[in-house]
Every structure is written in C-alpha cells, then in structure tokens.
Design a protein with these regions (language model features):
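Helix-to-loop junction immediately C-terminal to a conserved catalytic motif
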Residues: 51
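Conserved ABC transporter NBD signature motif
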Residues: 56-75
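Conserved ABC ATPase "signature" region
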Residues: 97, 101, 108-126
Length: 245
C-alpha cells in the first residue's frame, strides 16, 4: 500500500513549549483518518508541519513521495485551514472560481465542480453574496467547498465542521466517505467526538504526543468503553499517569 504521509521524529518547539514531541507516523493511500485532541494539543501545528508551513526543530516529513516543504506537491493536496483564507470583497462564486482557476481546472470542469460542492455544503443559494456578508459558519462551508474543488488524491481538513449544524455535518461526512470510497486519502481534525466513529483510523494527540492510534472499534474495546468520548478521557488519564511515573 502506498505511503501518502510519512512523519519521522517530527519535533517542534515554540519557546519552551514542546508542541510536537518526536512524532512518527505513516498514513497509507485510501485511508480516512481522524485526528482529535484537546485545545492546545498541537493538532493544527501537526497539520502545518505536514504541509511544510513551519520550520521543524527536527525530523522529516514526506507527502505523496515528496520531501516537504515542496510547493509542487501542494498542488496535489486539497487543504482547508482552521482559519478561513477568503476574499471578503468577492462573492462566494468568485472565490470558488478564483481558487478553482489556481488549481488549473478548466472552465467547463470548474462550472460542474462549483455546482457540486456548493450543494454539498448547502451554499448554492448564497453564491452571489459577498463573503463579507457571510456568517462564520458560511465561511467555513465555503472554505470546505474550495478544498473539495480539486481532484487531489489527498485531502487535509482542519476542523471543517466547526460552526456547522448537525444535519449539514452529516451531509459533509457522507461526501467525505464517498471520496474515501473513491480511493482518496482524507485526514480530518475535529473536536466533535460523535462524528469520528466512522473513520478507518483514529489518532489522539495530547501534549505533542500521539497517545492512541487504531480503529475506533479497537480503541473502544481496548479501554472497555462504548464511545470515543470515553476513549478520549481514558487514554488521557493513562497518558497523565504514565507521564508522572
């Protein structure tokens, strides 16, 4: 199975804060992977490290067989940041068109893709509004739509369902599962424990360490609980106990 993401001893400090502590992991093609952790655990920093957006203090990152940072490799990644990078003076449609052209999509393909992704995130009736008039949740949905525009083999989505109502979250996860079934690799961070049950593989990050890595079902059996929220609590307690030994 092809390795899509490879991290070897990835290390990062911000001053005296050890944000990523020699993290090593491999994500293979076609996997749907969830990354969870408390606020400040290092999730967004780990994503930034994967994408070559920050200078590491140690370790190596490879994405799609390319050493990072690598600008050309980024063209094969659909990325949604935690902070929306949108043009407020443009409409939703103009934002989608602009980013789609940057991805190299032809006009005919782009038209079809915009129709599809705007329906997926339920923005089809709001594309003519300036983004400055969008609510926070609408901006998140537009950012997700932009990430879904490309036919990239790898999607990295940093908390894409924050501020989105439960019904639409279900629809978005159905779309992500469809892309996963098509063979795409999807890495998603979230704090919504209930929606992470459907992933192939769950990573739990705490204090810059991966403290759990397996399927949700395996982890629930390992910790003798019935939901991921309880796994999260139990794994955290075990980590805290071991770290003080």
């Amino acid at each position: 199975m092809e390795k899509v993401i490879e991290l070897k001893n990835v290390d990062k400090h911000f001053g005296t804060n050890h944000v990523l502590n020699k993290i090593s992991l491999t994500i293979n093609s076609g996997q749907l992977v969830g990354l969870i952790g408390p606020s400040g655990a290092g999730k967004s920093t780990l994503i930034a490290a994967m994408l070559g957006m920050l200078r590491l203090d140690g370790g190596q990152v490879r994405l799609l067989n390319s050493d990072m940072p690598n600008r050309s490799a980024l063209q094969n990644i659909g990325y949604m940041a935690q902070n929306d990078a949108l043009y407020g003076n443009l409409t939703g449609l103009e934002n989608l068109s602009f980013f789609g052209k940057l991805m190299g999509l032809s006009r005919s393909v782009l038209t079809d893709k915009i129709h599809l992704v705007s329906q997926t995130v339920d923005l089809q009736d709001h594309l003519d509004l300036r983004v400055s008039q969008y609510s926070g949740g609408m901006k998140r949905r537009l950012s997700l739509a932009i990430a879904l525009l490309s036919d990239a083999p790898l999607l990295i989505l940093d908390e894409p369902t924050v501020g989105i109502d439960p019904e639409l979250r279900i629809k978005i996860w159905q779309e992500l599962d469809k892309l996963h079934q098509q063979g795409k690799t999807v890495l998603i961070t979230t704090n919504v424990m209930s929606e992470i049950e459907t992933v192939d593989r769950l990573l739990m990050l705490r204090d810059g360490h991966i403290i759990a890595d397996n399927t949700p079902t395996f982890l629930e059996k390992q910790y003798q609980v019935t939901n991921i929220e309880s796994v999260f609590i139990k794994a955290g307690e075990r980590y805290e106990n071991n770290s003080h030994i």
